[in-house]
Amino acid sequence: MTQQIELIRSFYTALAAEDAPRALALMADDIEWTTMWHYKALGRGPQHVAEGVLMPIMQEWTEVAFVPSEFIGDGDTVVSLGRFSGVHGITDKRVDVRYAHAWTVEGGRIASFRQYIDTLAVAEARV
């Protein structure tokens, strides 16, 4: 397994442990974070990811899990395939969808993230 894959695996491990400081420490200072749903990092950097993505998800959902099942690496690019699940805090609806996450690693830190997910299923759980 490559160092890049191990780094991304460490990120998911930190999320599963609800250890946001450890997850954020794995990111480059100017990380670019791109999502397909309404949670957005409104700038570059770990603080923007925390404020625009991670904190809102944890506030809006319970039983949150990002569970990777496969990692594919090519140099500094890592793709993780897995499932996102959770229960929406207001509607009490459960979502369980597949995702593809594309990561770029530079200098031993996460430089970029792109998310691909079933946005309709997530949106339906929110209403």
Q: Which functions belong to the PLM regions below?
A:
Residues 1-29, 126-127:
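Short, low-complexity N-terminal intrinsically disordered segments enriched in polar/charged residues
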Residues 21-24, 28-76:
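A solvent-exposed, acidic/Ser-Thr-rich amphipathic alpha-helical stretch
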Residues 5-14, 36-40, 57-61, 81-83:
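Short, mixed-charge, low-aromatic patches
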Residues 8-11, 23-24, 31, 49, ...:
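Hydrophobic pocket/interface hotspot
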